[in-house]
Each structure stands twice: as structure tokens, then as C-alpha cells.
Regions:
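ATP/NTP phosphate-donor binding region
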Residues: 1-61, 68, 310-315
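Catalytic core of DAGKc-family lipid kinases
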Residues: 6, 16, 37, 75-200
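Short acidic/glycine-rich loop or secondary-structure boundary segments that cap or lie
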Residues: 146-149, 195-197, 208-213, 239-243
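ATP/nucleoside-binding phosphotransfer catalytic cores, i.e., glycine-rich phosphate-binding loops
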Residues: 189-190, 218-226, 233-315
């Protein structure tokens, strides 16, 4: 099997020594080419090169942003059923998609999962993706406060300062008090009637929405990568209601509910129009401001190599 390993050497948890260790292990089972990214957007270019070159597997070692670039590269190559499988070795600070796919947080253990899947010839999992305008996403996208938090964190990262889950929480708290508490968004679900009076929109392709350290934050517990998108939208930013919903998101088995919350776990599309330009983030990357966006579920879009189920392991 021909494979390319795409590595972001600047991701939070990647090192040269670890890259070489993981590549050596993978090379025992596949014909491996290792390529490192050098700039933003390079991972997508490398993914296109891998598809055109006939790779059957692309292994990504990096954070969520690198994974997103690779997925968009695969999709832009328009290879259809001949597109390579994707496997993810966590290398970032949060690694939402990798964890949602059942991969170990430790990249060495995740490599063992991939090798085991290759040895037993485990079929890949075919999953849906989300798409906003012309950009695909693997785990979430959003308009509003979460996008502004992402921008603030990216600005800090650009200065060379460290980032953390606690930093995200502080920025979210700050952004809440800075934001205009007048609703700016109108949404339409599955091309239905418009619903005005919305402050923010989170759209998920998997559960959980993200993680706070080891704890999953679950906006849409019923959303899976095998079905449609999860919608989470707030029609009120009053502090008591926001705190109540925030507490629900941190509970492992809670289903968020509130008078000011619009939520659905399986929708085909969400169209959003904005009274004023609003920030957009996709898989943790800030894409600038938009005066509207359309989120669509793209079924059966990507084949992902995941850990071996117990039933296969025992055969």
C-alpha cells in the first residue's frame, strides 16, 4: 500500500524525534513517503499531490487545522471512490476529530491502532463531512462568539505565546462581555422558514463539539459523522441562561436545553444571514467575517481508518 505521512512540524505536540519514530513504525506496513508542511495551506497541496500520485492512505500528524487542510485537499482532488483513506495521529493541543474517531490521544498508541487496522485489513469508516460555502469541516464550524475566540487565540499564537484550554475559556468569558447583545443572525434549517433573533450558531459534524482538557463539551450528543449536522444556536445571551447552558455542556451525559436555545442533532443544512458581518471559524481556524453562510451535510464523503473494533481484534 502506498501512503503519504503529512506532518506539521510546528503543531503543539509534534517533534522531529517523534515524527521519525512514527514514520519508522508505519513503514513496516506501507510504502511511506513523509512530507512536512512549511506554511499555511501546504498540507492541502500535499494531500492533492498524494491523491494524484495514487496514494491509498494519507496519515496526518498534526493538529485539527492540519487535518482540515488535508481533508480539503482530498476533497478538492475530486477522486471520488478512488480517494485515499485518511488516518490521524494526534499532534495538536485538542485533536477533536482524531478523538471523535476513537484514536488514542498518544500518537504512539494511535500509530499502533493504525498498524493493527492495516494488519487485520479492517475496512475504513465512511463518514459525512460538513461544508460551509466551499470549505469542508470535520468536527465543527461556527458564526459569532466562538469565531471571535478562535481569532483571539490565533492572534496570541502568532506572537509565539503558549495557548491552552484555559486560555480559550478566558477569551470566551472576555468575548461574552464585549459582544453586542442584540441578535444579528437569522437562520433557516433545511430550507425551512427563517428564524430571526439568533446571537450565535454552532454547527457540528461529530460529538463532542470540542474538549476542555480531557472533558468533552457536548452541544449535540446525538450528532454523529454517520448522519446529518448538529445545530446549536442561542436566541438569548442573558447571563443566567448562558451559565445554565454552559454547565450542561460540561456534564458528560446531559442534553442541553433552555428557553433561549435552538438545538437539533440531525439536519441537512443551515442557512444563516447576518445583520452585520460576523466572524466565521471552521475546525478551529478563523476565516474572517461574513454577512451570511450556508452549512451543508455531505454524506459518505471520506473514508477514515480508525481503531480496530473488539469483534475484529478477537478473530
Amino acid at each position: 500500500m502506498r501512503a503519504m505521512m503529512i506532518v506539521n512540524p510546528h503543531a503543539t505536540a509534534t517533534t522531529e524525534r517523534r515524527r521519525d519514530l512514527l514514520a519508522h513504525a508505519l513503514a513496516a506496513e506501507v510504502r511511506l513517503i513523509v512530507a512536512q508542511t512549511t506554511a499555511r495551506g501546504h498540507a492541502a497541496e500535499l494531500a492533492v499531490k498524494a491523491v494524484v500520485g495514487g496514494a491509498e492512505l494519507i496519515v496526518v500528524h498534526g493538529g485539527d487545522g492540519t487535518v482540515n487542510e488535508v481533508v480539503n485537499g482530498i476533497m478538492s482532488a475530486d477522486a471520488g471512490k478512488d480517494a485515499p483513506m485518511l488516518a490521524v495521529l494526534p499532534g495538536g493541543s485538542t485533536n477533536v476529530f482524531a478523538r471523535a474517531m476513537g484514536m488514542a490521544a498518544d500518537p504512539v498508541l494511535a500509530t499502533e491502532q493504525i498498524l493493527e487496522a492495516l494488519v487485520v485489513r479492517q475496512p475504513p469508516r465512511t463518514i459525512s463531512l460538513g461544508r460551509v460555502d466551499d470549505r469542508y469541516f470535520t468536527f465543527n464550524a461556527g458564526l459569532g462568539i466562538d469565531a471571535e475566540v478562535v481569532k483571539a487565540v490565533e492572534d496570541r499564537r502568532a506572537t509565539g505565546k503558549p495557548i491552552s484550554n484555559l486560555l480559550h475559556a478566558r477569551k470566551a468569558f472576555t468575548q461574552y462581555f464585549r459582544t453586542d447583545h442584540h441578535p444579528r443572525l437569522t437562520i433557516s434549517v433545511d430550507d425551512g422558514p427563517p428564524r430571526p433573533g439568533v446571537h450565535l450558531v454552532f454547527v457540528s459534524n461529530v460529538d463532542p463539539w470540542t474538549y476542555f482538557q480531557s472533558r468533552p463539551i457536548r452541544t449535540n450528543p446525538g450528532t454523529t459523522a454517520d448522519a446529518g449536522l448538529g445545530l446549536f444556536a442561542l436566541t438569548s445571551l442573558r447571563l443566567p441562561g448562558v451559565l445554565r447552558v454552559a454547565g450542561q455542556l460540561l456534564r458528560r451525559h446531559a442534553t442541553p436545553s433552555s428557553r433561549g436555545l435552538l438545538r437539533s442533532d440531525n439536519v441537512n443544512s443551515v442557512a444563516v444571514t447576518c445583520r452585520d458581518p460576523v466572524g466565521l471559524q471552521v475546525d478551529g481556524d478563523y476565516l474572517g467575517v461574513r454577512d451570511g453562510a450556508r452549512f451543508d451535510s455531505v454524506p459518505d464523503a471520506l473514508r477514515v481508518l480508525t481503531g480496530v473494533p473488539a469483534a475484529l481484534r478477537s478473530e
